[in-house]
Amino acid sequence: MKERFLVTGGARLEGTVHVSGAKNSVLKLMAAALLAEGTTTLTNCPKILDVPYMVRVLEGLGCSVVHSGSTVEITTPAEISSNADFDAVRQFRASVCVLGPLTSRCGKAVVALPGGDAIGSRPLDMHQSGLEKLGAKTHIEHGAVVAQADQLRGANIHLDFPSVGATENILTAAVLAEGTTVLDNAAREPEILDLCVMLKEMGADIEGEGTSTITIRGVEKLHPTQHEVIGDRIVAGTWAYAAAMTQGDITVGGIAPRNLHLALEKLKVAGAEVTTYDHGFRVRMDRRPMAVDYQTLPFPGFPTDLQPMAIGISTVADGVSVITENIFEARFRFVDELVRLGADATVDGHHVVMRGVEKLSSTPVWSSDIRAGAGLVLAALCADGVTEVNDVFHIDRGYPNFVEDLQRLGAQIERVQV
């Protein structure tokens, strides 16, 4: 049964919220458990829909998975299937991260082309070319990417773009390859670093993690481990922008502020008071935000996943903002929904010009992806009246306890069945 959120605008959000493990990390760590026979335990896992989806994928490959609260235990047998179940994989984009581990462990991988958010083209070209340089043969057939290799061998690999997914699949393939792999122009996102930390805990030989050049010396075997998932910087950033948009005061825990440095700096420019701690931060805003320009870039640039929040705050800011999207070409789809709420926006290619308005007005809107959905809820908090936010299953894929956390912060929001 479909659900929607009813959001009453006008509340000033105040209080403390703690973020759980990162969606963009936990799914890749679960896939990495395929690399070692035995039981790998992940803690601080978020309560989001994509985790059970990944559990289905792993169970379809032959793993035994126990998911209890924020802990996931994955027992990988000596022999696993190389064929990832189509019905499970097509549910979400991150499922493609089993490609590297399966090619490495089984010598073959058949992974259905993934589903996920409608935010633009995200081809697997770099995933395939990376595996091919390691010695695999790859092709697309019957709606799946197929990779085969008798023995992967280390290679020098340069990525044309620092793709997060390609970096992850090359890492998980190279750790058991024969010889040394040097990956140049690798993604530097904190979630990549988290994956490298876990792989090293499993016995991988990796240097340069967190930089644009990663060196992987293949080992014969990895062993299972226990690992705590890093905090979700995108969820944390969402709360930061919620505080600024509602002229509120929110303290966020469970996150390293350095992973959100630029996003928090932008809030300072907009007029917010930002205080950072070892494992969190506080954002306080007592005025209408000032207009700020944004452009999304790979880490350490402004995250594309926070672009909807940047557009959201620009909607109600004092002045004109230009937001440039450099990662995904279709991520401005939700701007039409903001216009329905009264936003003054002009989209021109991969730029959107936002002329801030003092107040938005309620109307039904529809979420098109995880982050756009969250951005619409934040905009609804700034609107007069009650806004219906539809297709909220998108939000549930990436935000644990979203409604409950908002209610604790003072928002008037309820989940209703349609």
From Swiss-Prot:
The gene is murA. The active site is at D117 (proton donor). InterPro entries: Enolpyruvate_Tfrase_dom (IPR001986), Enolpyruvate_Tfrase_sf (IPR036968), MurA_subfamily (IPR050068), RNA3'P_cycl/enolpyr_Trfase_a/b (IPR013792), UDP_GlcNAc_COvinyl_MurA (IPR005750). Keywords: Cell cycle, Cell division, Cell shape, Cell wall biogenesis/degradation, Cytoplasm, Peptidoglycan synthesis, Transferase. Its main location: cytoplasm. It catalyses: phosphoenolpyruvate + UDP-N-acetyl-alpha-D-glucosamine = UDP-N-acetyl-3-O-(1-carboxyvinyl)-alpha-D-glucosamine + phosphate. GO terms for molecular function: UDP-N-acetylglucosamine 1-carboxyvinyltransferase activity. It is found in: Cytoplasm. Cell wall formation. Adds enolpyruvyl to UDP-N-acetylglucosamine. GO terms for biological process: cell division; cell wall organization; peptidoglycan biosynthetic process; regulation of cell shape; UDP-N-acetylgalactosamine biosynthetic process. This is UDP-N-acetylglucosamine 1-carboxyvinyltransferase. UDP-N-acetyl-alpha-D-glucosamine binds at R93, D305, I327. Its EC number is 2.5.1.7. Phosphoenolpyruvate binds at K23, N24.
